[in-house]
Design a protein with these regions (language model features):
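GIY-YIG nuclease catalytic motif and its immediate N-terminal context
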Residues: 1-57, 83-95, 111-118
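N-proximal short alpha-helices
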Residues: 27, 61-65, 109
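Short, compact, well-ordered microdomains
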Residues: 58-61, 66-99
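Coupling/hinge elements of helicase-like and P-loop NTPase modules
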Residues: 98-109
Length: 118
């Protein structure tokens, strides 16, 4: 059974993310991804990223997310079109205010697209 989670954006749109462990090998294409920690049964996003190459970017800040923010899982959603990825990213960040995204980003994913603001 595929592990999926729906995350709502600030707009009210639901985005369905799939557990990265079920996407092996990690796809090379564009995607949105989130690092998650669990609060009981509720997933909490600690970082939201978007990239034009999931396999190249998704693990760049994973160690920091685990050690500094308690992240335990990665979920991803494949999105080929950059404008769609960026809009989804902004919607998710606006709703969930992930701690690794607030106060300015210097992290993976967004750096790959040349976007540095949150």
């Amino acid at each position: 059974m595929t592990r999926q989670i729906d995350f709502a954006g600030q707009s009210g749109v639901l985005y369905r993310y799939k557990a990265l462990e079920e996407m092996r090998p990690v796809p090379p294409g564009g995607a949105n991804f989130v690092y998650v920690k669990w609060d009981g049964d509720a997933p909490k996003i600690v970082y939201a990223g978007e990239t034009d190459s999931l396999h190249r970017s998704v693990f760049e800040t994973w160690d920091e997310a685990q050690s500094g923010y308690g992240a335990t899982e990665i979920f991803a959603r494949l999105n080929i079109t950059g404008v769609v990825r960026r809009a989804e990213h902004d919607d998710i960040v606006a709703q969930h205010q992930p701690p690794m995204n607030t106060g300015g980003e210097s992290l993976a994913g967004r750096r790959k697209t040349g976007r540095t603001g949150g």
